[in-house]
UniProtKB/Swiss-Prot annotation:
Species: Ruminococcus albus
Basic and acidic residues bias locations: 27-38
Reactions accelerated catalytically: Endohydrolysis of (1->4)-beta-D-glucosidic linkages in cellulose, lichenin and cereal beta-D-glucans
A single GO molecular function term of this UniProt record: beta-glucosidase activity
Keywords for the protein's UniProt record, in alphabetical order: Carbohydrate metabolism, Cellulose degradation, Glycosidase, Hydrolase, Polysaccharide degradation, Signal
Compositional bias (Polar residues): 57-66
E.C. number(s) listed in UniProt: 3.2.1.4
Active site: 212 (proton donor), 332 (nucleophile)
Keyword presence, Iron-sulfur: no
Source taxon at top rank: Bacteria
Region described as Disordered: spans on this chain: 23-66
UniProt name for this protein: Endoglucanase B
Amino acid sequence: MKLKRIAALLTAAVMSVGVMASCGGSKSDDKSKADTKSAAETSGAEGDSSESEEIPVSQTHTNDPMTVTSAKDLVAKMSNGWNLGNTMDATGEGLESEISWLPTKVYTNKFMIDMLPEAGFNVLRIPVSWGNHLIDNNYTIDPAWMDRVQEIVNYGIDDGMYVILNTHHEEWYMPKPSEKDGDIEELKAIWSQIADRFKGYDEHLIFEGLNEPRLRGEGAEWTGTSEAREIINEYEKAFVETVRASGGNNGDRCLMITGYAASSGYNNLSAIELPEDSDKLIISVHAYLPYSFALDTKGTDKYDPEDTAIPTLFESLNELFISRDIPVIVGEFGSMNKDNIDDRVKCLDDYLGNAAKYDIPCVWWDNYARIGNGENFGLLNRQEYDWYFPKLMDVFKKYAESDPSAAAA
C-alpha cells in the first residue's frame, strides 16, 4: 500500500506539471499543487487517463450493453458503500466549489476511487448539488460542471463499482402546495439533462432523485407533515417519469426513491408511495444511529450494545419493504469521531451485522472531516492516500468478504 501511495502521488505530480507551467507556479509550490489538483480542474485540458485525453468525457459510455435486472437482484450484488461527501455537493459556484468545503483542497482523482474496492466497498455514492450550476432561466446545467460530474462517475464505473448519482443540497425545493408546481418544473428540467447525459451507461449507474427533501427551516423540518409527505411522493413520481422518458438505457435503470427527509422514522417511511413502475425501484433511507452516539456532537462517546435503535430500524425496513420484495439502501450512515475508536468499531459491526440479515447495503458518509468538534465522519485521507481508522476498515472488509454475491459482482 505504501508503494502504491507513493506511485499515486508521483503520478498526480506528473499530471499537474502542465497546469502549473501555464499558471506560472513556482517549483516550491509543486508538491502542494500536485496534491490538490486533478486533471478535471482544467475542464478537459489535461486528463488523468489516456482515455480522457483522447475522448471527451461527454462521449464516454454512450452505448454500454445493459443487463436488465430487477432492483432486488441488483441490490443483492452490493456490499458496502462510500459517500464522496462535502465535495460535489458543496453549494458554491464554478468548478472550484468541489474543494470549497474540504479541510485540505484536494480535487477528487482516480487514485482515491481506486482505493475503495480494495477496502471492501463496491458502491460509490456521489452527492451532487446542481442548483448553483444553472446558467440560464431554462435551468440549463453548466456544461463544465456536467463534464466534471461525469468524469468522477467514470472513476467508479471503470472500477466496476455501482455508482449512485443524486441531486443533493437543492435549496429550491420546498414541499408546500404553493411551491410544488415550480419545484416539479425545475426537478424535471434538471433530471432530463442528467438522464440524457448518462443514458448510455449500464445498470451499474443508479439515479437517486432527491436528497432529504423537507420543510427547511420550519418547526417540522425533520419530522414532517402529512401534506409535505404527499407532495414529496409527487416529486418522486415526476422524477421517475422524467428518467423513463429520456431514452437509452434509462427505461430499465434502477432508481432510488426517498421519503420525507430520507428519514428512518416509521411515520415517514410508511408514507412512501412508490410511483407506478417496473421492479426497478429502491428505497433510500438515511440513519445515523444510535443518534446520541453517532450524530449528536454533544452526545455520548460510548456505544451501548443494548440500545435497540439499530435493530429496530432494520426490523421496520423489513416489515415495510424487504418483506414485499422492495429493496432498500441505507444511503447515509456513520458515527462521528469522538476519539472513541473501539466504540465506533462495535457500533459499525452491529450496524452492518443487522443490515446483512436483510441484504441491505449501507453507504458510509465520508465528509473528509476527522478532528475538531463538528461532524467528523472522515475515513479516507484524500491527500496521503490511506485510511484514518484501520480498525473500522477491518469491519468493512469483514462484511464484504462474507457476502459472496457482492464479491462476485
